[in-house]
Amino acid sequence: MFKKFKPVTPGTRQLILPSFDELTTQGELKGSSSRRSVRPNKKLSFFKKSSGGRDNLGHISCRHRGGGVRRHYRVIDFKRNKDGIEAKVASVEYDPNRSAYIALLNYVDGEKRYILAPKGIKRGDRVISGEGSPFKTGCCMTLKSIPLGLSVHNVEMRPGSGGKLVRSAGLSAQIIAKTAGYVTLKMPSGEFRMLNEMCRATVGEVSNADHNLCVDGKAGRRRWKGIRPTVRGTAMNPVDHPHGGGEGRHNGYISQTPWGKVTKGLKTRDKRKSNKWIVKDRRK
């Protein structure tokens, strides 16, 4: 769910934010009426130093990055390799480092871990990893154990490497077929991809499905997130961009990047190195 704001200021006129109804509040943990969000677990978080879009030489390697509010990085368990031990969901929390929400798990042996929060999970639910786990939201197991047609997320590309695919807000992949030690998944992009049947995945869809409907409403909110302005190439000088310069406006050339590469329609995949694990590409 998301909420719109009354246009009492120019910045709130277009503003659309998540309602955060799924998140656990301090009041729920302490038995009070507080609506403040839960603080991250100290042993599972640390301050993340911002790179400002620079590489190890100090050169800009990613444009339009810099500034923003200092962030606590939450250590997420993407491997889900604590098998056979049940865990209780202690809280569902906001994470500034990703579009999805995260859930804090309290295992019965006392260990605590963060995972990506699946859609519909709430405080008090119980999840488990490993073979023989029930096919319910939040449980993790190998792809060969999951029945056809079920939606999964946080999918490994190689057994034991940790989830790499389908981790953004609202995404899920569907298990289509199983043949000769491989499982075919339909990815959110529409691509059909084969993976080793021993790769792990978590049952369910990623939380915060309305993330793509949010509107920041003002430039300042983008700056809080560490996103700097994007200057048009036509507004630059010829020394700075292929589109720069000229008397007045001129649009008689192919759109290019600042480094002269064609931006629209140029194929980048090498025909001789096609990925054999992609059964059907994402083109409709």
Curated annotation (Swiss-Prot):
Signal peptide bounds: none
One GO cellular component, as annotated: large ribosomal subunit
Ranges of Basic residues composition bias in the record: 36-46, 264-284
GO biological processes: cytoplasmic translation
InterPro entries documented for this protein: NA-bd_OB-fold, Rib_uL2_dom2, Ribosomal_uL2, Ribosomal_uL2_bac/org-type, Ribosomal_uL2_C, Ribosomal_uL2_CS, Ribosomal_uL2_dom3, Ribosomal_uL2_RNA-bd_dom
Pfam families, alphabetized: Ribosomal_L2, Ribosomal_L2_C
Skewed-composition ranges (Basic and acidic residues): 240-250
Top-level division of the source organism's lineage: Bacteria
GO terms, molecular function: RNA binding; rRNA binding; structural constituent of ribosome; transferase activity
Keywords: Ribonucleoprotein, Ribosomal protein, RNA-binding, rRNA-binding
Stretches for region Disordered: 28-50, 232-284
Subunit structure: Part of the 50S ribosomal subunit. Forms a bridge to the 30S subunit in the 70S ribosome.
Reported function: One of the primary rRNA binding proteins. Required for association of the 30S and 50S subunits to form the 70S ribosome, for tRNA binding and peptide bond formation. It has been suggested to have peptidyltransferase activity; this is somewhat controversial. Makes several contacts with the 16S rRNA in the 70S ribosome.
Family membership: Belongs to the universal ribosomal protein uL2 family.
HAMAP family according to UniProt: Ribosomal_uL2_B
NCBIfam families hit by this protein: rplB_bact
Record protein name field: Large ribosomal subunit protein uL2
Name of the gene encoding the protein in the UniProt record: rplB
